[in-house]
Amino acid sequence: MRRILAAAVLAFAFASCEKSTGEIGLDFVDGSQFAFGTKSEVAMRTHTEAFDSLVTLRPAALLVGSYQDPIFGRPTASFATQLVLSSVAPDFGANPTVDSVFMILPYAGWYGDTTAAFQIKVQRSDSALTDSVYYAFSTAAAGETLCDTSFVPKAGVKTLRTGTRVGETSMFLKLSRQKFQEWIVDASTANPSVLESNAAFLDYFNGLIVSGGPNNETMYQFNPGDASAKVRIFYTNDSIRADTSTAGLDYGVYDLLWTSGVQSFNMITHDRSQASFDLAAQDTVLGESSVYIQGLGGAVTVLNLDGLRALRDSGYVVNYAELVVPVREGSNLKYQAPGGLSVLQVKGSAKTLIRDYQRGSVGGTFSASGVLRKGAYRFEITRHVQDLLGLDTTSSYRMMLIPERMASSPLRAVLHGNADAVEPMSLNLWYTKPN
């Protein structure tokens, strides 16, 4: 049975005359086996905020694209990356000519309508990528355009029972051969010092910016950790052209790499003009009936655990604490919910994982069932609650829920807030009174 704050306060106020030792429950071992004793629900307030200052430097996936979400509006992603030489001081032979150039982008995932046409553009970066920290709001100046095309990607990594692979594992973009003739092949003889080391090359060539068109309805994720993440230059020279034997080469190959280790970052914007909720009008006094989670810094849920303040000197021992976060039924049919969430404690501008993570997993995995994907996230936060009820008077009663892989995944979810009339988000405590 759900109990509101008043009931919780009355239940604990009975023992408020007993002096607290200041070490409430700290010697207990966390675990659901300790969910015994009296159960009570703690009052809280929930609302939604944007996540400021999301670091997107060297993310697990680089993103391009956008889509119109009827609830969250339109998120848009692009990325900038350095390129490095596959070998220094390349020798392209006599009279080399670039035949073609392709940028290979290994798929890591996608979100949205994969049957829709997708516009994508590749440009040389006019901004050097330094050792600075890059955020979602960081930008890079785009220079000369190397590719601007629209097509329907055939992304897929499924393998049928027959062993036949469906779809392509990478996106291939044809870049301007004339530009790479000038910048790489001709430079190998006209200005060889820029190719003598990767340090010299990075001073010479800032990198690439990859972005999407304004009407895309998909966001694609690409894996910089894949060995096939590269720009591949196909070329011929006098020797290759003169060899007409069947065993002879048709072309030479040289690669510029954008694999893990180079500087790269995601650039993110959110247009919430068509969103179904307003971040500027959140009820932070009473809380909201629906709250929101969105990757790429789009939305996070803030919890104020007001009910715990009244319990600090109760003298009761909290054996187990569970946070239950229901997902709005039917909200994740078209757009997938995150596989997991994390819980942060918020102290001023500082955001850190709660102490329960020091002992391993606290849960937070999404479990759903039924046609409408009904489910919830569940967290064991016993140690954090014990800390808040202990002597640490500097503890903050604010927590934050964030999606996993927030810098590289757009997954989102609609959650039940504390003001939901049927199944609100809840913090349940199991407690006992020491003799």
Where are these regions (language model features)?
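Secreted, disulfide-rich extracellular signaling modules
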Residues: 2-435
